[in-house]
Amino acid sequence: FLAKRQFKAINVTIPYKKLVMEYCSYIDPRAKAIGAVNTVVNKNGLLYGYNTDYMGFAHLCDAHGVNFAGRTVLILGTGGTHNTTSAVARDKGAAKVLTVSRHPDPEKGELSYAEAVSSGAQIVVNTTPAGMYPNVGVCNLDVAAMPGLEAVVDVVYNPDKTELILRAEEAGVPVAVGGLEMLVAQAVYAAEYFLDRKFEDAPVEIRRITAALRRDMLNIALIGMPSSGKTTLGRMLAKSLGRTFVDLDEEIVKADGRSIPDIFAAEGEDGFRTKETAETQRFGKEGRQLISCGGGIVKKPENLRALHQNGVILFIDRPVDALAVGG
């Protein structure tokens, strides 16, 4: 395909970002330094290679106020994206860039995750697939034990907030951001190469597209007291917005084969809540859903985390005197 060159421009993804360089007549100096090309343009039979992942990551950090100057930066992972993010950090004046690996090579100066906690880093960048859909909820770094952190950036974009980002938010890290905007930005900058023209206000357009994607992709979860109208409103909203409607209580019954009163009678509230958490975690990592939650879902923090990772949570605040009583 590359040898025939019967295309005008292409995007290249893993695992071909290095291999494609062999076919390029010209490689942008930045892409050459990183050792990866993700954008190839055919100019009169000659292939020109660029790396817009660099531009995308730089945009993400600039847009969210990540200041690398004089900082110690931890980069989690040793794959291809490590080189890209490391190049951005160094170009923006990082004082030190440290690599963290599950299997560190001391000769390369790599750190274990345990060692990383006491590194004194101000910025953490995750380039590993840890926490990526469908294996959500994974986080290998104890950010709560790193009080000097100023920013945590995760290039993973699905879910919207990985476990690393959720923990960073809980720890009060000033900037905690996932990778969706980086994905959009690299595509916009690749399009500039494809079309051979600069887009006016590209950063503004990137933010607009990212916001639109997030609105379209994220779940809407409804919480509130029993009989507050979550199911009724949920069905109406799902139909109006073109989303899949999920009633978690109904899903618990489907999965277990017993009614909710029967589950309570046989296993008590603890047994029911365990099943509720399992269903919340199952649906919470998906997208474009309208989720109606049981009244007691707020009793377990892990339920709210599961809903928060890929959605917004709305509280239906119906007046107490309007709620049903009994049964």
Question: What residue spans do the PLM features occupy?
Answer:
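Rossmann-like adenosine-cofactor binding region
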Residues: 108-176, 297-304
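NAD(P)-binding Rossmann-fold cofactor-contacting core
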Residues: 91-109, 249-251, 255-256
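ATP-dependent small-molecule kinase phosphotransfer cores
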Residues: 250-308
